[in-house]
Design a protein with these regions (language model features):
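Bacterial N-terminal signal peptides that target proteins for export
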Residues: 1-10
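Solvent-exposed, polar/charged alpha-helical surfaces in well-ordered, non-transmembrane soluble domains
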Residues: 71-82, 102, 106-113, 133, ...
Length: 205
């Protein structure tokens, strides 16, 4: 169940990498919604019945326009990192650029597709998978990792504005620990509440 609190923040009632009964916060923005920015500082092992290649098979061939959007988001992230930013009133210094990692892109694409096809919005995917599970299933081993999600924003510029205006997401984008990034964008014209679904998966090998 999704419910709106008095501050205008949507609260999704489910457990997310926390004790039972925790709530995942979803912020409403003028262009859409953004899920609570998540970060993991130590690697966790995960098992899986598929090889990384098989796991990524359905997102290897991608719509050219979607892939272009993903590249634009990566470029916008690096522009922000180069310029420095203010996240929740706290100044963040310029940090080095992140580079594309195709395994993280696989994990991000899988999650954006999952949210659109199954019409939900959460860091927890089908099969109760966490972001860290998807990264490991895609073959990526990390020492630190983070995920940002968003929905309904129709352009790379709009989704970046939403993320940068949200403290947790902005912190993930401006975190110099992360060296790699994968972006996933998926569009579903009908049958999905928000149509446009976005995921950023950050990693530090």
């Amino acid at each position: 169940m999704v419910r709106m609190n008095r501050s205008g923040v949507v609260l999704v009632g489910l457990a997310l990498l926390a004790g039972c009964g925790a709530e995942e916060r979803v912020e409403v923005t003028p262009d859409g919604v953004v899920g609570e920015g998540m970060a993991m500082e130590t690697a966790e092992a995960v098992g899986g019945e598929y090889t990384a290649q098989a796991y990524c098979d359905d997102v290897t061939t991608w719509d050219a326009n979607w892939a272009s959007f993903e590249t634009q988001v990566l470029n916008l992230v690096n522009q922000r990192r180069a310029a420095g930013a203010t996240c929740g009133g706290v100044a963040k210094p310029a940090v080095p650029a992140v580079a594309l990692d195709t395994r993280l892109r696989c994990a991000a694409r899988k999650h954006s597709k999952d949210m659109a096809v199954n019409n939900f919005f959460s860091h927890t995917g089908t099969g109760n998978t966490a972001p860290w599970d998807r990264m490991k299933l895609a073959g990526y081993t990390y020492n630190a990792a983070a995920e940002n999600i968003a929905a309904n924003q129709a352009t790379p510029e709009a989704v970046m504005t939403s993320w940068m205006n949200s403290t947790g997401h902005c912190n993930n984008i401006m975190n110099g620990t992360y060296k790699k990034l994968g972006v996933g964008y998926y569009y579903r014209a009908s049958g999905a509440t928000y149509k446009h679904y976005w995921t950023q998966d950050f990693g530090a090998p």
